[in-house]
Swiss-Prot record:
It comes from Burkholderia multivorans (strain ATCC 17616 / 249). GO terms for biological process: glycine betaine biosynthetic process from choline. This is Oxygen-dependent choline dehydrogenase. The lineage of its organism: Bacteria, Pseudomonadati, Pseudomonadota, Betaproteobacteria, Burkholderiales. One of its GO terms (molecular function) is flavin adenine dinucleotide binding. Pathway: Amine and polyamine biosynthesis; betaine biosynthesis via choline pathway; betaine aldehyde from choline (cytochrome c reductase route): step 1/1. The gene is betA. Involved in the biosynthesis of the osmoprotectant glycine betaine. Catalyzes the oxidation of choline to betaine aldehyde and betaine aldehyde to glycine betaine at the same rate. Keywords: FAD, Flavoprotein, NAD, Oxidoreductase.
Amino acid sequence: MTTREYDYIICGAGSAGNVLATRLTEDPNVTVLLLEAGGPDYRFDFRTQMPAALAYPLQGRRYNWAYETDPEPHMDNRRMECGRGKGLGGSSLINGMCYIRGNALDYDNWATHQGLENWTYLDCLPYFKKAETRDIGPNDYHGGDGPVSVTTSKPGVNPLFEAMVEAGVQAGYPRTEDLNGYQQEGFGPMDRTVTPKGRRASTARGYLDQAKTRPNLEIVTHALADRILFDGKRASGVTYLRGNERATAHARREVLVCSGAIASPQLLQRSGVGPGAWLKELDIPIVLDLPGVGQNLQDHLEMYIQYECKEPVSLYPALKWWNQPKIGLEWMLNGTGLGASNHFEAGGFIRTRDDDPWPNIQYHFLPVAINYNGSNAIEMHGFQAHVGSMRSPSRGRVKLRSRDPNAHPSILFNYMAEALDWREFRDAIRATREIMRQPALDRYRGRELNPGADLKSDKELDAFVRARAETAFHPSCSCKMGYDDMAVVDNEGRVHGLEGLRVVDASIMPIITTGNLNAPTIMIAEKIADKIRGRKPLERANVPYFVANGAPARNVAKAVRQPETV
């Protein structure tokens, strides 16, 4: 067994861990050990580097932990997919590359919780900007010299994108030019984490590329964190496995857990920090009975509303193997073409009821009919909307099954456990059908393939959701930030009741944000990095942002009305 000593040990080189490793080692007097259970960020592997290949990493286990849930009781007892990134970059290495920060009111809502007053949107915005380089330049809402490359959608990429956005507007919903700017609510172009050369902009590329040559940063891959070590109530180090070899590293200052919403509570529980009754079941010595560890688990559930496309403008031909070498060659040589986009270039956020204070439904538009993980491709020209609710009241949990660090935990999201979930999904299907019926899509819209136009009653729609809805791969909130009895960390990520230990990743969100989670996770890490370094927070932003204040969710008077049948 080898033993070494560092100022900080970071467990997990993902969206948050790479931010911390980079920011902490800006101080040459600080030493950092970054542990990653997966392998390097192989730049020659098109599966992780080509944006259009985003489904491939989810189909194997090289880059994906490939967790499965326990049978979900409200989803026909299905064991559902729970993909999480494995390798330098973490889930930013395998995600859909949608750059969505969340709604301003997400953060203002966090700040209404005791002790989280400094997590308002205006407190967080400077850290979003710090992390970002937007291809069309900075403004009051966007950064221009950060590590994360953000590419904006350009007109003319595919006519279906513009048609679907226009259809949303024709249905009476707002148009927005920037889902990350003044107004998230509405339909418009979607930003993505792709470099100017058409490569995936993971945090391994954006952050670690500038930090990995620093002498005060040691990166160890294929290193699976086993347990956090404690000296009394103070975290003193980490034991980890590299193959069959066990190693120990000691932390002079802090251990920083950045393993994600599944593995962070798993590591804490394995180390003796968690619900006491759970730990006793596995004969784990209790360091601290902390009941919230692994509780409050949240995710976004989504469904695919799919249509036949009457004109041959979809991406269906790109799914054929004989067309893919040409696409790949253009991407490899020039960084352009179909391979250089994730093809989520338009989308939106709407309120389905006037009394919703901010959007409760998200749309990703896609000019092909296929599941996110590449399965169940429709054998014809088609298009779809990925549609899902944003702040489900259902809560799940992550529970340790075994002391073996290689064993997956028990995961239960408890999807669709509340009546509000069902109402929102029914509303979402009906709103989507109304959008898809608008004149902007007349030349393209064929048959409704899924759910199928004949499914109309609440009972029929509910059965479709139970059988066909899937994860959006946004697990979060399982080590929540706050000061109530179920909070795990304080407003700086420090674990309650312990010293020298923080959790910094999507697990500390108290409530899931409205949209994709990579950008908020990076922001959280940027913000807490300043806290760890003892630096003064960035100056609070002073910009306006949209608040509905009870305004109608859609302008029915301006909506173009069409028959319900297609």
